Amino acid sequence: MNSQFAGLTREACVALLASYPLSVGILAGQWIALHRYLQQLEALNQPLLHLDLMDGQFCPQFTVGPWAVEQLPQTFIKDVHLMVADQWTAAQACVKAGAHCITLQAEGDIHLHHTLSWLGQQTVPVIGGEMPVIRGISLCPATPLDVIIPILSDVEVIQLLAVNPGYGSKMRSSDLHERVAQLLCLLGDKREGKIIVIDGSLTQDQLPSLIAQGIDRVVSGSALFRDDRLAENTRSWRAMFKVAGDTTFLPSTA
């Protein structure tokens, strides 16, 4: 699935990634069924797999480390979200493990510019070649949006968390919408070339209004695996973007 990214420039990769409106939180499923999940997602041409890497220090939860990135099939786009105390070391390990997209927490590192600049020089393998590492910045619900201003030129993905990581407390829908509006206002004419992502316990009925506001992608885990209906739920969630945005380049198998 990721062969279409081989040899593309950073700008072309971002444009292509923007046509995939869903990143599947693969760790939310039953690990014993991982092979079945991956087969279903491949059949749906759903390349983006989202992995939350937590170390129990940035937030009170442990998940997996960079080793998990390497274990996933090479055919997928591995979308890694770092929620760790040492983002620099973790970012290096994730690139070595084959992560295609790496999102840092704005609150997690005073040396964000250094890490993002380094990531901007890295490439990772895809089927048939290589692609540049796509860089993201993520913000907790209470983090002021203007902290991203100094690094806007160093990121392609801006991710707003709708939950407090490791705690599960959610933003009210009205507050989330206001935050999206504030982000769009902040970006202004720098909106082009940025993928805006919402991550955190969204329900399907929240999607239409968020899509109408102009977001590009959502990250979903538990909701997609609900009732052991990953394929059906993935189709349904992707269809929401098709109806609302008429995304021309959305994969046809949905």
UniProtKB/Swiss-Prot annotation:
TM region(s), chain numbering: 14-34
GO biological process: carbohydrate metabolic process
Residues annotated to bind substrate: 81, 166-169, 199-201, 221-222
One GO molecular-function entry: racemase and epimerase activity, acting on carbohydrates and derivatives
Active-site residues annotated for this sequence: 52 (proton acceptor), 199 (proton donor)
InterPro entries tied to this protein: Aldolase_TIM (IPR013785), Ribul_P_3_epim-like (IPR000056), RibuloseP-bd_barrel (IPR011060)
Cofactor(s) essential for the protein: a divalent metal cation
Record keyword Nucleotide-binding present: no
Main location: membrane
Keywords, alphabetical: Cell membrane, Isomerase, Membrane, Metal-binding, Transmembrane, Transmembrane helix
Membrane topology: Single-pass membrane protein
The protein's enzyme class: isomerase
Binding site for a divalent metal cation: 50, 52, 81, 199
Subcellular location: Cell membrane
One of the record's GO cellular component terms: plasma membrane
UniProt record similarity statement: Belongs to the ribulose-phosphate 3-epimerase family.
Name this polypeptide is given: Putative epimerase LsrE
Protein encoded by which gene: lsrE
